[in-house]
UniProtKB/Swiss-Prot annotation:
Belongs to the PHP family. It comes from Tolumonas auensis (strain DSM 9187 / NBRC 110442 / TA 4). Zn(2+) 2 binds at residues 16, 41, 195. The lineage of its organism: Bacteria, Pseudomonadati, Pseudomonadota, Gammaproteobacteria, Aeromonadales. Transmembrane segments: none annotated. Pfam families: PHP (PF02811). One of its GO terms (molecular function) is phosphatase activity. It comes from the Bacteria. This is Probable phosphatase Tola_0828.
Amino acid sequence: MRYQVDTHTHTLASSHAYSTIHDYIAEAKRKGIVLFATTDHGPDMADAPHAWHFINSRVIPRMVDGVGILRGIEANIKDEFGEIDCNEKMLNELDIVLAGFHEQVFAPKDRDTNTRAMINAMKKGLVHVITHPGNPKFPVDIHAIAEAAAKYNVALEINNSSFLHSRVGSDVNCTAIAKAVRDAGGWVSMGSDSHIAYSLGDLEMSQAILDDVDFPADRVLNRSPRVLLDFLESRGKPHIPEFAGL
């Protein structure tokens, strides 16, 4: 199955990425992607865009040539209290908030500290998706984070790039996460974590993980635009009229 939704992409505003939103729209049309989120790194990353980049995201059209664009961020979990680098002005302009651990902001800690930080980030109610929770550099209590994600209605990501060129060794953890989320009745999100437009929508390896554990298709945010949009509305985000036809 070729999914039509990608929740995790980076533009050249994150200067270790290489494509514009225009590039992503063109690639989306080529691949049949009907909705994607632009989720550049939060400002505490060394080469991330300024907070104004996110505050001004209101200028991004909702629809371009039949492709829907969600305004988002991949925020950084900053400490064990679950604080993220996304202030209220930024949050007010964003449709979707991803958050995860990045070594440049939060150095890897022991399993208990990492787990506490991740759960606290979910508990605060600002984050919709936890990115690459299977990163072996940040060990966590997988069952505890899956239960917390189900409790706080947060999706855990199966990150496709983790199996290709980053976060080596994530496959075993991601399989365990998929099983734990399945058993807890929670949500998963598959993200390409694309840093160049050509990998937009590349979710095949994430899908293979879900297939291996018989993960229920109706608990995958990428299943359709409407599933993702309904999930975001269930988390308090407003209805977006421009997406009514998706």
